[in-house]
Amino acid sequence: YANIDFAIGFTNYNDIKTYLGMPQSAAFTYDYMLIDIDNSDLLNNFDVYSSKKNYFVTSFDLYALKRGVEVLKRLSLPVEIMKVYFSNLMSQSEDDYFNYIATGCRVKWNQDKIYFPLLNEDLDVIKENQRLSKIRFKGLSNEYKTSLMEWTQDICGDSNGVKKACRQIERGV
């Protein structure tokens, strides 16, 4: 993807700096860094406690839920987190079930949640985008695009800029 870097398999910021040939003391120049932590040992390595924003992203398959809760249970300090759900149903009962299995985690859940529908048409477009290393909206459901815009606006706090960028993506610019 143009102007987007992916760093997969790193265990801390210094590993990423070494890979990029940066001195350990150098600061990253990225506007945003999204870090997927699926291992509780990485909570401290990537210092989630001082992150500006934290998200818990999951589907409702039992394995994904339990593995995610396993990581959350290892938090040593309270952390504010927003839920991002990928689900077909998007019901309150799913959220209630998740809250039940996450009882005891040191999390202050953000009131807002973002739901992404899991529709076959969206999955097909996502796979095609990955294969082509491009970001295209054509073929994505309106619900998916809306969720993507909401999440992006939450991350960067600039709704006008996000709307403009989404219009450009829609036009293929």
Predicted stretch roles:
Residues 22-31, 46-50, 76-80, 108-110:
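Flexible, charged surface loops at secondary-structure boundaries
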Residues 9, 33-37, 54-60, 82-89:
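Conserved beta-strand segments of the P-loop GTPase G domain that flank and frequently precede/overlap
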